[in-house]
Regions:
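Catalytic-core regions of glycoside hydrolase
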Residues: 1, 32, 108-285
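Aromatic-lined carbohydrate-binding surfaces of glycoside hydrolases
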Residues: 1-180
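Surface-exposed intrinsically disordered loops and tails
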Residues: 137-146, 449, 453, 460, ...
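Exposed aromatic-hydrophobic patches
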Residues: 234, 540-542, 584
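C-terminal functional modules
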Residues: 277-495
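Disordered, acidic Ser/Thr/Pro-rich linker "stalks" and the adjacent N-terminal cap
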Residues: 438, 444-447, 451, 473, ...
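Trp- and acidic/polar-enriched beta-sheet ligand-binding modules for extracellular glycan
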Residues: 562-584
Length: 584
């Protein structure tokens, strides 16, 4: 939360599905120890940083461990009893310092379909609003507010959260202080003016966007773990104006620290109202010095992280929403997110390696064809070394170290494969075989750097999955053939006329939707802008105000955010927001 406070984020939503008192046993109260050591410190951090710690409950779930424990609407007696228990649970956290609440119905039974929305969700939200207003009026003996700073803003996520265009006029009956969460037309939806305008036209309310990005939960269905360090071109669409959204909430990765990169961009998007894709590209470029060492000035370490992150942008959505007719959406259910595209044009990783891979697959590569590729892999190798030697934030480095080690070995193997191929083409096959063996060992070693996935299963950390790694595999096959070495089946790849990514990385489609950490961003395009997840550790150096861009002076009034460990609670949902909102 402290980190987020530097960048104008203003809301952090606590909704961890692995906390049984959040959903499965929502009636249960926290122990005194839990209040003192878990809830109260987070509430205090939120109040101090101006990034409100919002406590959420999900009382409508009726499955698994929560079966039969849900909030009931079948009789008036049950409703009043459960409402009393709901208030008591919220009250326990309000007494501990919480100053805003949220009510979630996502992934739960749609009780509105059974009893009517006005008799269920609308009624609960109205009753909670009235109750909050009563608490706001309570005074201490000296006349001061008993719950100073208590907000009546309630974040509400409906059971049908994707919204595909139906009227849903009942949303108009929800109190105006309630913010309605939507994922943008599909589970892995986008923040776009088109969606927001449709929702507002049909419901009379602006949506609070919940974007499942940079969420990497669906790599639980892959043989490896990846980081999502880009994708703003697909998930944060330009063209929004003030009031388009009521907020933007991001679902980050299990790795909280690198999630700050997407969170930073969402806050920038919210406050600065991107009007072109170039705005997003500039935000991506700018983000690394801020997430690495809280400064507008790039360092050797942050530049190294940037060069690697350029090749770690893909997001697997598991095919939850079906195939998309989008050039950036691969048939293997992956958003490519401009992976290996250098927005500055200085290092054409995609162009150079795509051209080389075509020649490698066709068996036509010559010694002269390896020069530019060698520059690419050498640059990436140097980037990994520079970041390892100069990390600006130890927490960040610790969380992504397996990927840095992966890049160390992958680039070493690529350079040796190129050397072996050139030696073989020059006729020195014996030396080429020895060099090839060294390259093969380095490639195998690159898969030994593991990290726990969503289900706490250790898997190898990988990157460069669209362009960089497939080209290394093509180099292996070419070097093996030209040197007379034998390529193990595990590394042999079928030839393809397609020189870009052939999706053969063990991905499997899944229809399970993500449920990890959620953050949020809220801003001018949203009422308030916001969003971030990260570990609650003291920030690095004191932040330096970011210089304004020519198009806006918003850099100096950037986002507020929040920090919290999403690795300790892998199923945590968090939200953050930034921007001006009513002080009520």
């Amino acid at each position: 939360m402290t980190w987020g406070g530097y960048y104008k984020m203003n809301t952090y939503v606590y909704a961890p599905k692995d906390d049984p008192l959040h959903r499965n046993n929502w009636r249960g109260l926290y122990t005194e120890d839990q209040i003192e050591n878990e809830i109260k410190p987070q509430a205090e951090a939120g109040n101090k940083s101006k990034v409100r710690f919002v406590y959420a409950l999900a009382p409508f779930h009726n499955d698994g461990e929560a079966r039969g424990k849900h909030f009931r609407f079948d009789t008036e007696e049950h409703y009043q009893k459960d409402l009393k228990e709901l208030k008591a649970k919220y009250m326990q956290t309000i007494d501990a310092g919480v100053r805003q609440i949220a009510l979630l119905a996502d992934d739960s039974t749609d009780w509105g379909a059974q009893y009517g929305n006005d008799n269920t969700y609308v009624r609960v939200l109205k009753d909670l609003t009235d109750w909050i207003h009563e608490l706001q009026q309570e005074k201490n003996d000296d006349g001061t507010a008993k719950y100073e700073g208590l907000k009546d803003t309630i974040l509400y996520c409906p059971a049908l959260y994707s919204y595909t265009g139906a009227g849903d006029a009942w949303y108009k009956d929800i109190p105006s202080n309630v913010q309605i969460v939507m994922t943008g037309g599909r589970t892995f939806g986008v923040a776009s003016k088109d969606f927001a305008d449709t929702f507002t036209k049909n419901t009379g309310r602006a949506p609070f966007m919940w974007i499942n990005w940079p969420c990497s939960d669906m790599n639980r269905n892959t043989a490896y773990q990846y980081l999502v360090m880009g994708g703003q071109n697909n998930f944060l669409k330009p063209g929004a104006t003030y009031g388009t959204y009521d907020g933007i909430m991001l679902n980050p990765m299990q790795q909280s620290e690198p999630s700050k990169q997407g969170i930073f961009m969402a806050a920038d998007y919210s406050w600065n109202l991107w009007q072109s894709e170039k705005d997003g590209q500039q935000s991506w470029e700018d983000s690394f010095s801020y997430i690495d060492h809280n400064s507008p000035i790039a360092s050797k370490g942050s530049r190294g992280l940037r060069d690697l992150a350029m090749n770690m942008r893909i997001l697997n959505d598991g095919g939850i929403d079906g195939a998309h007719k989008d050039a950036e959406y691969d048939a293997s259910t992956v958003w490519i997110n401009n992976e290996s595209v250098d927005y500055t044009g200085k290092l054409d990783v995609k162009g150079v390696l795509t051209e080389l891979k075509g020649k490698l697959d066709g068996g036509t590569a010559t010694a002269a064809d390896f020069s530019q590729a060698l520059t690419v892999y050498t640059t990436l190798q140097r980037a990994a070394k520079n970041y390892r030697a100069n990390p600006g934030d130890k927490n960040m480095f610790d969380q992504i170290e397996p990927w840095i080690s992966y890049w160390d070995d992958l680039t070493a193997s690529a350079i040796d494969y190129i050397t072996a191929a050139k030696q073989a083409l020059a006729g020195d096959t014996e030396t080429a075989k020895a060099t090839y063996a060294t390259a093969k060992a380095a490639f195998a070693k690159s898969d030994t750097h593991t990290i726990a996935d969503y289900y706490q299963r250790n898997k190898p950390a990988r990157g460069g999955l669209v362009i960089v790694r497939p080209t290394v595999q093509a180099l292996d096959s070419f070097a093996a053939k030209t040197s007379g070495s034998v390529t193990p089946d595990a590394l042999r790849r079928p030839r393809s006329a397609r020189t870009a990514w052939v999706p053969r990385h063990g991905m499997r489609t899944s229809i399970r939707r993500p449920s990890s950490t959620v953050t949020t961003a809220r801003s001018s395009g949203c009422s308030p802008p916001a969003a971030t997840v990260s570990r609650p550790t003291p920030p690095s150096p004191s932040p330096t105000p970011r210089p304004a861009r020519p198009r806006s002076s918003a850099s100096s009034r950037r986002k507020r955010a929040v920090t919290r460990s999403s690795t300790a609670r892998s199923n945590t949902r968090m939200q953050m927001a930034t921007g001006p909102r009513s002080a009520t």
